[in-house]
Amino acid sequence: MFHTIIIVGNVGRDPEMRYTPSGQAVTSFSVATNRQYTNNNGETIKETIWFRVSAWGKQAEICNQYLKKGSKVLVEGRLTPDKETGGPRIWNGQDGTARASYEITAQTVRFLTSRAEAESGAPAADETAAPADEADIPF
């Protein structure tokens, strides 16, 4: 059996790298994904889902070096279930409401924010470009 998850979002805080007792690098960071839709009442609903990502080995070192809060990334990997529940990790937020944390072990991390954008704080190119007209698509 095989499963994979692909997300695109923004890094929520600067990555943290550490080493296992055997010397293998592991970097952890959070990624927020956003979705907007209109419900049956005509209200616009904005939904954010947070993922905790772990990258290992050389990829961990590269993520730690180049990612920072706000960087746009694509993460491909596998969901890592909570050992106790077999699903997402459930916890209570500061306001007392139940929250879920989805954890991904990364196989691929792609940086979608260019180095120049990261240094200047400018938005990613796809955030400023006009939407493509379907007639302009070359296939």
Task: State the predicted function of each range.
Residues M1-F2, R18-G23, N39-G42, D95-T97, ...:
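Acidic, gly/ser/pro-rich intrinsically disordered tails
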Residues I5-R13, V31, K69-P81, A106-V109:
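OB-fold and OB-like beta-barrel modules that bind single-stranded nucleic acids
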Residues F29, Q36-V73:
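Small beta-barrel nucleic-acid-binding modules, principally OB-folds
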Residues W56-I90, T97-A98, T113-R115:
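Beta-rich strand-turn-strand
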Residues T4-E47, K83-P88, A100:
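Core FKBP-type peptidyl-prolyl cis-trans isomerase
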